[in-house]
């Protein structure tokens, strides 16, 4: 009876959470010499959906919901997450000063510190992988290795942080967080937001033709309105992949919870029908194969789509300058919450050290 119950629960879990899922946090701090405290923004994502955000430039800086399914959380949750975000902002402020000293930089320039961390669940609902990474001024600084037991430093300055991190048992602390706490909260969020997070929207696809000259044309394969964001677009010529000749844009949010992407190839005029676009997405029962259909060629929707993507690019740039340059961060501590405490904390003497492991 017990075995049957366990099997049925495992089956239900697999059916509910088909595919892998992730919980990720991104924290970014940008110093503003002569203009007060550094700007600090923190965002959390479940899969491709932003669900929380903190901005210390807000009129009343607090962690706030960014997804409707998070609005049901009570005040204790938001108070706890706000305290964690404020603690991280303070730690980042100190670390920016420390790193400026490591790199012998003056106080005049603006500098950026970023922190990303998170965990993935496999299709079976169990821990798949964890990750944590720091960057300074847009370059990798310190990365938690795949074994979650040690760090990789990119230069001499980062090696100082690495030694202090290892001395403070921070990797051990982070491994426990990533394998346990992060996974626990990811499961909770998937349950809370399952109607939004676990739905599938297959891509709407078509191929457009753009004449370059009398001898060449561009074929562009469009995928619109899909969720989740993971998708594969591949061009083939006579059945052979054309990856090295394909222009592929990054997947872009459409602003309505779905995503957009296109892939393009330049082809000799008159040979368009030798090229096929292949689309793979979780929402499709089977991969799609598309060709350019001259009879259906229209320009009005293409212009509209292109204009929308250009506008989207501007919007996304503003929204993700923080999130894209940095990475996703931690979740909650042992008492709950989804947000974990920040990395380094310098002493009053200016020495940098990670939080020591508790006995």
From Swiss-Prot:
Q: Does the keyword Disulfide bond apply?
A: yes
- The cysteines joined by S-S bonds are 119-182, 221-277
Which SMART domains does the annotation name?
IGc1
Outline the segment boundaries, as ranges, of region: Disordered: 330-359
UniProt keyword list: Disulfide bond, Glycoprotein, Immunity, Membrane, MHC I, Phosphoprotein, Signal, Transmembrane, Transmembrane helix
How is it placed in the membrane, per its record? Single-pass type I membrane protein
Task: Name the GO cellular-component terms.
Answer: early endosome membrane; ER to Golgi transport vesicle membrane; external side of plasma membrane; extracellular space; lumenal side of endoplasmic reticulum membrane; MHC class I protein complex; phagocytic vesicle membrane; recycling endosome membrane
Q: Where are the transmembrane segments?
A: 303-326
Q: Which residues lie on this side of the membrane: Cytoplasmic?
A: 327-359
Phosphoserine-modified residues are 351
Gene Ontology molecular function: any one: peptide antigen binding
Q: Where is this region: Alpha-3?
A: 201-292
Its family? Belongs to the MHC class I family.
Write the protein's name: Popy class I histocompatibility antigen, alpha chain E
Please give the organism.
Answer: Pongo pygmaeus
Recite the lineage of the species.
Answer: Eukaryota, Metazoa, Chordata, Craniata, Vertebrata
């Amino acid at each position: 009876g017990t075995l049957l119950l366990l099997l049925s629960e495992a089956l239900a879990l697999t059916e509910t959470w088909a595919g892998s899922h992730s919980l990720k946090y991104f924290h970014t701090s940008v110093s503003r010499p002569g203009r007060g405290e550094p700007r600090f923004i923190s965002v959390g994502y479940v899969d491709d959906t932003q669900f929380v955000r903190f901005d210390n430039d807000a009129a009343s800086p607090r962690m706030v919901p960014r997804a409707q399914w998070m609005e049901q959380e009570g005040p204790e949750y938001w108070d706890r997450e706000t305290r964690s975000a404020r603690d991280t902002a303070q730690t980042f402020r100190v670390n920016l000063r420390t790193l400026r000293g490591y790199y012998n930089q003056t106080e005049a320039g603006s500098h950026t510190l970023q922190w990303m961390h998170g965990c993935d669940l496999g299709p079976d609902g169990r821990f798949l992988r964890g990750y944590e990474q720091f960057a300074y001024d847009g370059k990798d600084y310190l990365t938690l290795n795949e074994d979650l037991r040690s760090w990789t430093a990119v230069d001499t300055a980062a090696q100082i942080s690495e030694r202090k991190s290892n001395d403070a048992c921070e990797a051990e602390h982070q491994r426990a967080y990533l394998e346990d706490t992060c996974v626990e909260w990811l499961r909770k969020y998937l349950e809370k937001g399952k109607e939004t997070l676990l739905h599938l929207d297959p891509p709407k696809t078509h191929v457009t033709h753009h004449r370059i000259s009398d001898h060449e044309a561009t074929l562009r394969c469009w995928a619109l309105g899909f969720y989740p964001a993971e998708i594969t677009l591949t061009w083939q010529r006579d059945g052979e992949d054309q990856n090295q000749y394909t222009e592929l844009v990054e997947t872009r949010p459409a602003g309505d919870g779905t995503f957009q992407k296109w892939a393009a190839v330049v082809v000799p005029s008159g040979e368009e029908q030798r090229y096929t676009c292949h689309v793979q997405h979780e929402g499709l029962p089977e991969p799609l194969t598309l060709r350019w259909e001259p009879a259906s060629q229209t320009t009005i929707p293409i212009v509209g789509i292109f204009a929308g993507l250009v506008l989207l690019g501007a919007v996304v740039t503003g929204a993700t300058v923080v999130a894209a340059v940095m990475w996703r961060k931690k979740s909650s501590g042992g008492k709950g919450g989804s947000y974990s405490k920040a990395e380094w904390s310098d002493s009053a003497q200016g020495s940098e050290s990670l939080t020591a492991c508790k006995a």
